[in-house]
């Protein structure tokens, strides 16, 4: 902006240069549009005023249909109900709620108009209240007023839609058709994310896709392996396809920190927390449940972190994660969350509470779903004179199937078997003196009549058990370590079928003094790894439970994580960047043979790609098991070919190294021959390259470099 010059200054300047302003017709001077030469005009203040805003269109007006038709006496009550619902979602303008009335009957017409301050508030209200159930007979149908014009343009006569040619999408399960039946895994090291094949035959991984800055924190496979999820500041994204490099959908959720899939991959839960403006307040939490395929937000939950911090373990800002736990099965029909004195169970058909109310359970501490059936297991700790209890509740009827009271309980953990046949409840109880605790087990046989409960008797009643694990794939074998000593005992038990052996839980064996602090079952059962991680420096023992024998013992120094591949053929051990050295991973066979080792700086994540359950029937699987020798001939031949190929590659490698060595020797001989005359010259013309016997002599040569004469006075010499 130009400097402002007053009229007095202009007059002074004119007098100094000899110009008489009275002789000049200022009205005849025409300035360019918008130019005032630094002289303020009288109307500048008017020009600087904010322009008036006028409402354009009807984007801030809603039309709410399917309201009750009521007489004049109930008009104010209905208007109050509607105003209460919609004023929570935005600011309604003065006289912004209009409910038309039939002039003859003086009854409402079943719809109303609502005017908000902004179109954004109207859009939000439409999204939140469309389909709102006022009662069983009145479900709101909400539209924008602007949509009426669009509806009027719909032609009266139906015209058949244009049929577009079908374009098949990419097969998202293509990775399962690998001819070598290999499995994939993803790793994160530094800023790079890599998806690789585990090519155990070639004793190395094969790269599928690599990308830098693919995610801002971590990656996560969906439960069936169809999608790979990444996390960004703007929200989450899922990827899939042959190379896992195609982005399939994005989910807007600013500052998302955690994600979780439903078990059947139909829904994605995204979580974010935000710092409160008042330090005394807790973090604000936002949870969105989105449809995986369409990206549509089916329901969102908002509140303080305190509302989502009851029960569970892990998470951020005090929130237990996952907040929502999904029922077992292939339909993702129910999900639930724990609250203060309630369990809230929702159905995904409407994303509302079952029967519009939560299950009230005073002082409830934890719950878990059966992996196979819509059954909830609830744990309620002791409160006053009321004993602790574990209850089984059927959903959606909310009927209590079984209950067991527990006394002197310090802690309780529930462990479902993978196919939902058994529930093990690990109970830590106080001793009579209340100075220590001991562990016991209650086993619920879910599939048996009346759900009988059996107590697992321990050899040493003073044992405290930190870990427990069911054998997978329907195996009834469980084990746990005792930590009464630094080298715990590992014990194995068999849980027989109730109908055949009533009331018997038999111990199979005890492994004495093992250097282990964690157990990892193979997904296929039978095999497990006894691991001594972190403080035990990566001790590994590969154990066959059927034969009750150790197959191999090994070590992965400083190992922090162990993960079986989904088939149970291979296992990965890794050292993450919590240690500064030896970052990377090892791939082992199920029986403890080290196949290959990969070192990666700043390595911090390793995940096998899950596989969906087998589509084969039990009869077909039994048939394959019977004819396994016949089927295995093909794979044995392939293994033999690969072995021969590897041997040939090794021979070629050794041959190449030999040729490189011989080439180096020949080059050395050539240079030696070229320098022969020079060596002979240095040896006073004597050709001595071929001499085998020689005598080394050490010759000393004295050479006077400088002579200095100094005259010393006689008096000094006498002194």
Swiss-Prot record:
SUPFAM superfamilies: RNA-binding domain, RBD, Tricorn protease domain 2. The keyword RNA-binding applies. PROSITE patterns: RRM. GO terms for molecular function: RNA binding; translation initiation factor activity; translation initiation factor binding. Disulfide bonds: none annotated. Residues 60-147 form the RRM domain. Keywords: Cytoplasm, Initiation factor, Protein biosynthesis, Repeat, RNA-binding, WD repeat. One of its GO terms (biological process) is translational initiation. InterPro entries: EIF3B, eIF3B_RRM, Nucleotide-bd_a/b_plait_sf, RBD_domain_sf, RRM_dom, TIF_beta_prop-like, WD40/YVTN_repeat-like_dom_sf. WD repeats lie at residues 167-207, 511-553, 555-598. Gene3D superfamilies: 3.30.70.330, YVTN repeat-like/Quinoprotein amine dehydrogenase. Pfam families: eIF2A, RRM_1. It is found in: Cytoplasm. Residues 687-698 have a biased composition (Acidic residues). Signal peptide: none annotated. The keyword Cytoplasm applies. Belongs to the eIF-3 subunit B family. Component of the eukaryotic translation initiation factor 3 (eIF-3) complex. This is Eukaryotic translation initiation factor 3 subunit B. It comes from Nicotiana tabacum (Common tobacco). The gene is TIF3B1.
